[in-house]
Regions:
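Non-catalytic interaction/regulatory modules that flank or connect domains
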Residues: 91-189
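Conserved active-site tyrosine of GNAT-family acetyltransferases
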Residues: 29-31, 176
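Conserved catalytic-core motifs of GNAT/GCN5-like acyltransferases
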Residues: 17-19, 37-58, 182-194
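Non-catalytic C-terminal interaction regions
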Residues: 176-242
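Conserved acetyl-CoA-binding loop-helix of GNAT-fold acetyltransferases
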Residues: 1-10, 15-18, 26, 33, ...
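Conserved GNAT acetyl-CoA-binding A-motif
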Residues: 8-22, 153-163
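C-terminal "cap" of GNAT-fold acetyltransferases
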Residues: 46-82, 192-222
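Short, cationic low-complexity segments
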Residues: 81-112, 212-242
């Protein structure tokens, strides 16, 4: 990872990403020494059958991963669109990274009819990923169909990556919250078109979120926000379906 960081600096790559386990803080501390900043948390991404030799863990069931970003080169200014209730946490992330972002919360509807996205799912890991390139009027209807297929495949964790530079991103995130998607991460320069707002839906309510270890107070604050958002959105979705 350190070698990758040095290579990224030499070639002017904006930054590098790392996903660290949360059953202990060792890998997180190593990343902190390289200048990495916590940008998100993916709940229950690691199968509960995965264990680390010689490392005890109090986590029960599937394990979560902490997402970190390390700025290694020039990061240009961008205008992004996110829901208002994500505003404080995203502002904190970009301030800690010392990058320039103009943040809008206005829920602009899409200006195009047809969405563009790619989707993948694994029956082994029980994780599904959807990466949206273009937000169109048909996005939610098409995602509902895709997510139904994921559920039939036994997927527990579904992630949707939205292009934050799309003015309709805040609208799409609000619509996806109705489908039980909550904030997972804010990922600067993650796609060729810029920043990504990652949302997640974990359908197994037995997920252990009480033993997620973070290496410093900033990570703990981000973890607490993400866990509380997951609880709030999931509870809201369950109540609305009754």
């Amino acid at each position: 990872a350190e070698f990758r960081n040095e290579v990224a600096k030499k070639i002017g790559t904006p930054g590098t990403y790392a996903n660290c386990v949360t059953n202990h803080v060792g890998s997180q501390v190593t990343a902190f020494r390289r200048g990495a900043v916590e940008v998100g948390l993916v709940l229950g991404e690691v199968n509960d059958g995965v264990s680390m030799t010689g490392l005890a863990t109090t986590t029960k069931g599937r394990k979560s991963l902490l997402s970190l970003y390390n700025v290694t080169g020039p990061v240009g200014h961008r205008a992004v669109s996110i829901p208002e209730h994500h505003g404080d946490v995203v502002r904190t992330i970009v301030e800690r990274l010392d990058i320039s972002r103009e943040i809008s919360h206005h829920p602009h509807r899409p200006t195009v009819a047809v969405s563009s996205f790619s989707s993948s799912a694994s029956a082994v890991s029980k994780v599904g990923e959807i990466r949206v390139e273009t937000i169109g009027e048909d996005l939610i209807a098409r995602l509902v169909e895709d997510l139904e297929t994921q559920v039939l495949a036994g997927v527990l964790l579904s992630m949707v990556d939205l292009p934050a530079s799309d003015p309709a991103c805040a609208w799409a995130a609000a619509e996806l919250e109705r489908l039980a998607f909550s904030f997972s991460a804010y990922l600067p320069e993650f796609s060729p078109d810029g920043d990504v707002l990652r949302l997640q839906r974990f359908t197994d309510l037995s997920l252990d979120v009480d033993h997620i270890a973070c290496g410093r107070a900033e990570g703990e604050a981000l973890r607490d926000f993400i866990v509380e958002e997951w609880r709030r959105v999931t509870r809201k979705a369950v109540l609305s379906s009754e």
